[in-house]
């Protein structure tokens, strides 16, 4: 698929995915106006919002009005609909389970130095070890944000970026979300992708920057079109956000990456793809955590809005006779002064069988229990689809201080299973991205790549909950008593965040302390049989 040259935008073959991205983006953002726009304009492509009268009356063309957000509010009344940010919570928790504690990058086992205590220790870290340490500090925020958006949209992409003006000594990873990419796969592998960015909207005019990635090469194009059309290609120098590229590209508006593969790594949220399993261009995309539960999001908002309406309608009100009202002047109506002590005589009879009270109190009931139970039931179904535990969202109360693994491990087994599935994909993505970044740095002769041999690092994910120190200590004690683990293994278990140097020093201290407590050995030559 070469660089697009015009026509519909996004291209027709990507329409199913982009319609879904539009909906998932609206739920993720949680803006009521955006949700109303999406569900009052159900089409394959985004376009200018409009309101159809049939949406107010129902009917065939008003099917979307069955959604809470599919019926526009009346222009002469306050919008009673409220949104609960459950979709945003799902995406955030998904990312927190993976990357709340940053992953660590280390040399593969076959590349690590020997752990023989008698072997000489290296004076300093090797260049590749130092580069991995730097990346461990550089990428955690990128991964955390990427995982959150991937949970909402079904995936994201990591690309290796070289900008010698911003970062003269090294390349860095950047992220492109699924709704800014047009990928092409073969046998489940990404073979090319076009990233696009909307640079400017001026009335009907839309300026888009396209970035087409193929193995070893990136081509750029600036297009002047509309919201529905890509339009004509114009020079990169015609927009301030693209003019810097004009100094980098060759005669074909592209540049070489220096490596033979794509400078992009796709990052699917989870698989398999259910919605587009038989659609050629979308079958290899990741699956969103929102997929299939959009009606439940809408139902939760409907029940919550109904609850709030009950509160509004349940406000205490009073009905007073006309004689209690005082005129506010010609054409300005009348009002009642609740602080007034003396009123004129009443030209009315008291209520039959009631007290001689001319004020009637109106107070409607508020269905608290019914609404709460319905919201809870819908919330449980929302969590069931992407496979999360209620305890992960603090549904049983939050205790003071960090929660230990012993306290919540059994209750959150479902969430941990989902985390492990996502971690399998994320681990491969990180390994591929780091190796690709090192290869680009070496090919581009950047200072950070000198002396660094590209490799796939070992990636270790942090614990999503705090390990229980007592349980860890008891486990280590049992292993030691059973002679089932070495001192080094026990130190690594108790201190999983320590590096190799810290572990070596601790092992030496323990062995020295153990040796100091041992009784001295007797000299065998001093033994006498007749003693």
Pin down the residues of each PLM region:
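Extended, non-catalytic structural segments that build the interaction scaffolds
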Residues: 44, 48-51, 349-385, 402-428, ...
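Short, surface-exposed acidic
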Residues: 390-395, 447-454, 495-508
